[in-house]
Amino acid sequence: MAELTINADDVRNALNEFAASYEPGNAERVEVGRVTTASDGIARVEGLPSVMANELLRFEDGTLGLAQNLDVREIGVIILGDFTGIEEGQEVHRTGEILSVPVGDAFLGRVVDPLGQPIDDLGEIKAEATRALELQAPGVTERKSVHEPMQTGLKAIDAMIPIGRGQRQLIIGDRQTGKTAIAVDTIINQKANWASGDVTKQVRCVYVGVGQKASTIAAVRQTLEDHGALEYTTIVASPASDPAGFKYLAPYAGSAIGQHWMYGGKHVLVIFDDLSKQAEAYRAVSLLLRRPPGREAYPGDVFYLHSRLLERCAKLSDELGAGSMTGLPIVETKANDVSAYIPTNVISITDGQIFLQSDLFNANQRPAVDVGVSVSRVGGAAQVKSMKKVSGTLKLDLAQYRDMQAFAMFASDLDAASRQQLTRGARLMELLKQGQYSPFPVENQVVSIWAGTNGYLDDVPVEDISRFESEFLEHLTHKSSILTTLAQTNVLDDDTAAALKEAIVSFKKGFFGEGDNHLVGAGHEEHAAISGGDVDQEKIVKQKR
């Protein structure tokens, strides 16, 4: 048998050759967790010690989850999708990504879910970028005071509760009082600005439907399309059939889509319809995650849920492009109780509230705005000069009218001044009525309110106020340049006021003299205008019996 000999040089050369040719591979560290329990849209996962808060996780069937509770031994995960295929023992992988949504102009005219995926069967959406859902709100130095008007097209709001671009204005009221109608009318009213092509005037709108019936969201979309407003609107839909996690995330998705445009120097209007259902969804998620409950079983951070969302609405400084995002959150009350937990939270966060009263709605006063409770804390600085001039005493006049109306129920004989308040107040209330999907340009609103507050409608029967208003505005449109002047200057000077006075006096002479259109017909009560000086009881024209 041959003797085995080992040459040290050969060994050295072999090792050198191997070392020279060795190429180390890219070692990958993969964390894999396992599902311990899964039910009701919540999964508990163990084995992922390095996961981040709000990180996306991927289950075996491809469903995504959102890491929420980071406990010592396991993670509480919100399942973003169908959870019926997720079972105990399945693997869960990290993605290393924070939850974000695609954004861009391609989203205009589309309906998407809270993850930014289209659900309107119109094909894929080519996104310009992605934006994290949990994005920090602009800081104090990045903001500018609200000074540009956001016109709703509704006389009761634009005159007494004005909204500015960058403001947060709460719409609050019982169910079926017209909250969504106000939001939709506001979107429709932006059509003229969009058609102008002026970037400084155009407003991109985002409607976030949370917990609504799918048929309701579909009806909103159809309404916007019928009125030509869908082309500048994105709808983020999370109907009642969606899991609680989707309803919780939907407002943040809509806000992220709007913030992309805001930081691009554009103006955005976001409707959150409604935040009370988002709070209920967050309560359900928190209880399933076994977080300790607080008042009304809501978690302790439910205030932060809404504050960090609404604080994103802002008017940015000129250095950041001077864009703005206006928020119109909607909250539903029960039995007009605005002192409940969620309503008081959102009232304290926002810059004002529009309170809708069910009694007014049932009395056919629509929009059913309760002027006494409603307020806009910062919108007054954004109100156009002409509107501020004519509506200065409107709120006080209506408050005095309501007080006098309550007093008149028990008083058999009133002096002339009291009758004057009742006469004018009834006509102002009628003047503030407005049909749905028929927003008014601001110059038309100024003329209507000017006529009412200056007593030019006192001799018009209440039931004919609406017809008088529409025909007078049509008369001005075709036979006068007053509306054009008001639209261009936004100032009601003495010359314009004199021209308006001459026009309405002339119009009333012809209007009262019309044959079939005579304002006082069979069965109508005839009233006479009462000036402030008519204090003698004899000067009051009695009603015809």
UniProtKB/Swiss-Prot annotation:
- Give binding positions for ATP: 173-180
Q: How does it sit in the membrane?
A: Peripheral membrane protein
Its UniProt entry gives the catalysed reaction(s) as:
ATP + H2O + 4 H(+)(in) = ADP + phosphate + 5 H(+)(out)
Tell me what this protein is called: ATP synthase subunit alpha
Instruction: Identify the main location.
Output: membrane
**Site location (Required for activity):** 374
EC class (word): translocase
* Localization terms from the record: Cell membrane
Name the family the entry cites: Belongs to the ATPase alpha/beta chains family.
Quaternary arrangement and interactors, per the entry? F-type ATPases have 2 components, CF(1) - the catalytic core - and CF(0) - the membrane proton channel. CF(1) has five subunits: alpha(3), beta(3), gamma(1), delta(1), epsilon(1). CF(0) has three main subunits: a(1), b(2) and c(9-12). The alpha and beta chains form an alternating ring which encloses part of the gamma chain. CF(1) is attached to CF(0) by a central stalk formed by the gamma and epsilon chains, while a peripheral stalk is formed by the delta and b chains.
Pfam families in alphabetical order: ATP-synt_ab, ATP-synt_ab_C, ATP-synt_ab_N
Q: What does this protein do?
A: Produces ATP from ADP in the presence of a proton gradient across the membrane. The alpha chain is a regulatory subunit.
The record's listing under InterPro entries reads: ATP_synth_asu-like_sf, ATP_synth_asu_C, ATP_synth_asu_C_sf, ATP_synth_F1_a_nt-bd_dom, ATP_synth_F1_asu, ATPase_a/bsu_AS, ATPase_F1/V1/A1_a/bsu_N, ATPase_F1/V1/A1_a/bsu_N_sf
Task: Spell out the HAMAP family in the cross-references.
Answer: ATP_synth_alpha_bact
The terms describing its cellular component in GO are: plasma membrane; proton-transporting ATP synthase complex
Question: Which cysteines form disulfides?
Answer: none
